């Protein structure tokens, strides 16, 4: 589904300053967003096509070959030239589909933050070992590791897509802020009407860092927020950020009183009876209650 979004009104000072360098943004066509969201088998992960008049940038690349092919179809149907793919997170559901996308658009650059690219390279053998047998022909045969993005901006037809989060602990979690249309896309921090992936955030410090990232998004006052994972039909606005913040707080409270993972699962289901992702909730509960070992990426101490 396409999401036309209005152009940001610039302040007088900013407009005057910009006019000496190039035409004001008001004279440019606003960028357009189109979200592709996978089904539950791929954790409802999102990819977002950001389009200008003739060119486009893709944020995140899907998990399975099937979803990647559907994503390619969306890009082709848009009629835009795909210039670049940015991978915002180092989990397989964000990059396994790169192989299919590269085959369809070989001239499009594929990039990620330095920390994300390094994590993908280091963890790829284990990820293939785990997911290869489960995905079979639906998984990558020649997975692609992104190149390192130079700087913290992606340019699309004179408009800036800012990669935010590179100044955090290791630059592992990032999202894309598009100020001209006040939109946040990419990243794994925002969930919409879905149980949060807490397996990688099994300490109070990690959850606090997560909450800080969400408040950073909130402070930008975006009008559009595309959750990295969301139940189909979930809103794409700040309500997803507030949902995620509330969930983290509720999770911490339930975790502190739950005797075991079953009690934690039941408590969160009572609190969020309509949330998708029961498998995600169950895995996180086992990890957080110490019933299952999980090699998490630690970015906060």
Question: Where are the model-predicted features located?
Answer:
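N-terminal signal peptide c-region/cleavage motif recognized by signal peptidases
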Residues: 21-23
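Metallo-beta-lactamase
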Residues: 63-64, 119-250
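Positively charged n-region of N-terminal signal peptides that target proteins for export
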Residues: 1-7
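Accessory terminal helices/loops
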Residues: 219-224, 232-301
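Bacterial N-terminal signal peptides
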Residues: 9-19
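Conserved beta-strand hairpin/beta-sheet module of binuclear metal-dependent hydrolase folds
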Residues: 27-77, 175-188
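Active-site metal-binding motif and surrounding structural segment of the metallo-beta-lactamase
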Residues: 66-111
């Amino acid at each position: 589904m396409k999401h036309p979004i209005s152009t940001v009104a610039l302040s007088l000072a900013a407009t005057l300053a910009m006019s000496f360098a190039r035409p004001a943004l008001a004279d440019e066509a606003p960028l357009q967003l189109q979200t592709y969201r996978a089904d539950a088998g791929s954790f409802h992960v999102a990819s977002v096509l950001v389009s200008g008049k003739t060119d486009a940038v893709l944020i995140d690349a899907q998990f399975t070959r099937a979803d990647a092919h559907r994503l390619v179809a969306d890009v082709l149907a848009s009629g835009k030239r795909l210039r670049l793919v940015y991978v915002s997170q180092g989990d397989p559901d964000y990059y396994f589909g790169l192989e299919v996308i590269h085959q369809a658009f070989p001239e499009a650059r594929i990039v990620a933050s330095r920390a994300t690219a390094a994590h993908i390279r280091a963890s790829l053998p284990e990820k293939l070992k785990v997911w290869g047998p489960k995905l079979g022909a639906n998984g990558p045969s020649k997975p692609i590791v992104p190149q390192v993005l130079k700087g913290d901006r992606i340019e699309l037809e004179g408009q800036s897509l800012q990669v935010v989060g590179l100044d955090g602990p290791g630059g592992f979690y990032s999202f894309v802020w598009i100020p001209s249309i006040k939109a946040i896309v990419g990243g794994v921090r925002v969930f919409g009407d879905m149980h949060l992936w807490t397996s990688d955030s099994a300490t109070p410090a990690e959850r606090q860092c997560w909450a800080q990232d969400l408040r950073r998004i909130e402070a930008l006052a975006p009008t559009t927020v595309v959750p990295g994972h969301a139940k189909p039909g979930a809103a794409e606005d700040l309500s997803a950020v507030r949902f995620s913040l509330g969930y983290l707080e509720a999770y911490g409270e339930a975790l502190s009183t739950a005797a075991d993972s079953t009690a934690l699962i039941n408590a969160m289901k009572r609190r969020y009876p309509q949330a998708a992702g029961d498998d995600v909730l169950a895995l996180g509960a086992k990890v957080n209650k110490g019933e299952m070992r999980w090699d998490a990426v630690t970015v906060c101490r």
